[in-house]
From Swiss-Prot:
Protein name: Capsid vertex component 1
Entry's family note: Belongs to the herpesviridae CVC1 protein family.
GO cellular component, one term: viral capsid
GO BP annotation list: chromosome organization
Signal peptide positions on this chain: none
Region of interest called Disordered, as start-end residue ranges on this chain: 131-184
Statement: the UniProt record of this protein carries the keyword Transmembrane helix: no
Basic and acidic residues: compositionally biased ranges: 149-163
Known partners and oligomeric status: Interacts (via C-terminus) with capsid vertex component 2/CVC2.
Function: Capsid vertex-specific component that plays a role during viral DNA encapsidation, assuring correct genome cleavage and presumably stabilizing capsids that contain full-length viral genomes.
UniProt keyword tRNA processing present: no
Protein's cellular compartments: Virion; Host nucleus
Length: 478
């Protein structure tokens, strides 16, 4: 895979290992990843003991068609969509890996408007880094005779045995190996068994003319005056690059399971040069721990840390909305002139919508929420507006992190009345608050939030984040 080789050259020295993966079409559909020629790919590590992740590392990724799963090397390239890339893995100071760390893949769309995050546990990525050892199987079967003399873990195919018998013993030749010491491919084996069909002819003979002499052409050297070399350009020297051809190596494809979604993907293991020398197995941070210490290890620690962080932010917003209602004497005001169907008990209807919206907001824990996008953009000096469109009473999935920053063009509103006037420019927002069982949360880059209920009634809240919380948000989701 050229993409895997490119990642090895790009970031191979910046990490302990690289997990080379191929994500099939079913995996892409499950995580909402569509083919995008301009997409950009970044990877970071989220640790089990800290909310602060590693810096994002940009990696090379490419979409291509052609099979999925273990048959990736055999299927037609036009049959299915796949994404191939590499995930850098980080070791601790002792060169060991925590299998419960998470490698987070961030995919940014070509237009920059959409971000998708996919989490991989190290445990599911390090499997291909441990190639199987050589089996001591001789002529008499398993443990029935002498093993391979060179101690290699390779397996002979019938074609390689035929090639070895046809070529016979010779210097540098081995069972199933070419003269260069590499495993013979089926094509090379079959080609080597074919007889030469062309007629042997002599290319030189004393009765023939010198091949370098052509009649009618002056072959005398051009005698020029080399005294003045000022106008002579520098000689261009061309040299061939020592490029590595991955086709020369045995590539092992291993199927692995994405532990969070249950979908399958493929791990590619290269003996060299994209893998550590000799394919040495990795060492775990759990090695050497006592049974008592292992009982205290939480395999979901890295995942729970991030979830709790996002949940605290959402809970803080819900509490601020509740305090605003209490401080205002449970009064709510219509901010947008939207006509709705008249009810006998409009206060009770709005109260039910507010209560349900707060419950839904408390459960909306994810990196795609409007407040996350607003926090990242505000920290980078951008002024904008984002919205979460909420479906209440389980009417359907909510749509999170919709960018409404175009409403602030060419600049932010001067006062609150201008702000509400700008919101009238969003047809999608108006459609959401014209009917029941829906609500909209609007968040600006200063983390001020407004919960819009049917009829244009609004309640203002706020995300109260410390400076450290903002830095963590930008580091993880920026």
């Amino acid at each position: 895979m050229d993409v895997h080789l490119g990642n090895w050259r790009l970031c191979g020295r910046r990490c302990g290992r690289l997990a080379h993966v191929v994500l099939p079409e079913a995996f892409l559909d499950r995580h909402g990843l569509a083919e995008d020629a301009g997409a950009e790919f970044f990877v970071q590590t989220r640790f089990t003991g800290s909310l602060r992740p590693s810096s994002y590392v940009r990696v090379i990724g490419a979409f291509f068609g052609g099979g999925s799963g273990d048959e990736i090397a055999r299927r037609d390239r036009r049959s299915a969509l796949n994404l191939v890339l590499s995930l850098p893995l980080l070791a601790d100071g002792d060169g060991r890996y925590d299998p419960h760390n998470i490698a987070t893949l961030k995919v940014r769309s070509g237009d920059g408007r959409r971000l998708v995050f996919v989490d991989f546990f190290y445990l599911s990525l390090l499997g291909a880094q441990m190639p199987r050892g050589p089996e001591s199987e001789g002529e008499g079967g398993k443990d029935g005779g002498a093993g391979r003399g060179d101690g290699e873990a390779s397996r002979e195919s019938p074609l390689e045995r035929i090639a070895a018998e046809a070529s016979g013993p010779g210097p540098g030749s081995g069972r199933g190996r070419s003269a260069g010491g590499r495993r013979a491919s089926p094509l090379s084996v079959l080609s080597g068994l074919l007889d030469n069909k062309y007629t042997q002819i002599a290319k030189h003979h004393r009765a023939l003319e010198d091949p370098g002499a052509v009649r009618g052409v002056n072959i005398e050297p051009d005698r020029r005056d080399h005294g003045n070399l000022a106008g002579v350009g520098k000689r261009k020297v061309r040299c061939a690059l020592n490029l590595i051809d991955l086709k020369r190596d045995d590539i092992t494809f291993t199927s692995s399971t994405h532990l969070l979604s249950g979908t399958r993907f493929t791990l590619c293991h290269y003996p060299r040069p994209v893998a550590p020398p000799g394919g040495a197995p990795w060492e775990s941070t759990l090695d050497g721990l006592s049974e008592r210490q292992l009982r205290g290890v939480d395999p979901l620690a890295a995942l729970i840390l991030g979830f709790d962080f996002l949940e605290r932010a959402q809970t803080g917003l819900v509490n601020s909305l509740a305090r605003e209602c209490e401080n205002g004497g449970l009064k709510i005001f219509q901010r947008l002139p939207v006509c709705v169907e008249k009810k006998h008990d409009i206060r009770g209807v709005l109260g039910d919508h507010f209560t349900e919206a707060c419950h839904v907001l408390a459960r909306q824990v994810g990196e795609s929420c409007a407040w996350v996008r607003a926090c990242v953009s505000g920290e980078r000096g951008h002024v904008g507006l984002w919205a979460d469109f909420l479906n209440l009473w389980e009417a359907g999935p909510s749509t999170l992190g919709v960018d409404l920053s175009y409403l602030f063009s060419p600049g932010p509103p001067d006062d609150e009345s201008a702000f509400w006037a700008r919101l009238l420019g969003s047809d999608r927002l108006l459609d959401a608050i014209k009917t029941g069982a829906r609500a909209v949360l609007v968040v600006d880059s200063q983390l001020a939030a407004w919960l819009l209920l049917p009829g244009g009634f609004a309640i203002k809240g706020r995300y109260s984040l410390s400076r450290e919380d903002i830095q963590i948000t930008v580091g993880r989701y920026g």
